């Protein structure tokens, strides 16, 4: 009797651990998806500010490189 109770408790503990682990994997994949979508939106906003290859962006210290605004390049160089 004691052995069967112990096995039931161990089984419940194993199921709990497995469910908790699968929930964290699902949350990580959701977080990865959201980060990818937000990063894509930031990239699209940067492209929208560009007027063309090496054109000036709305900010005076930004310029376009391959249609992406960047703060680390000088236009025309």
From Swiss-Prot:
Disulfide bonds join 50-64, 57-69, 63-75. Probable ion channel inhibitor. This is U14-theraphotoxin-Cg1a 1. GO terms for molecular function: ion channel regulator activity; toxin activity. The presence of a 'disulfide through disulfide knot' structurally defines this protein as a knottin. The modification Lysine amide is found at residue 77. Its main location: secreted. It is found in: Secreted. One of its GO terms (cellular component) is extracellular region. Expressed by the venom gland. Transmembrane segments: none annotated. The keyword Lyase does not apply. Keywords: Amidation, Disulfide bond, Ion channel impairing toxin, Knottin, Secreted, Signal, Toxin. It comes from the Eukaryota. Residues 22-49 form a propeptide. Residues 1-21 form the signal peptide. Belongs to the neurotoxin 10 (Hwtx-1) family. 65 (Jztx-21) subfamily.
């Amino acid at each position: 009797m004691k052995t069967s109770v112990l096995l039931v408790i161990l089984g419940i503990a194993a199921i709990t651990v497995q469910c908790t682990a699968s929930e964290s994997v699902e949350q990580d994949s959701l977080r990865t998806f959201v980060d990818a979508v937000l990063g894509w939106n930031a990239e699209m906003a940067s492209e929208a500010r560009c007027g063309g290859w090496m054109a000036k962006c709305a900010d005076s210290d930004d310029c376009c490189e391959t249609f992406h605004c960047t703060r680390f390049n000088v236009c025309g160089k």
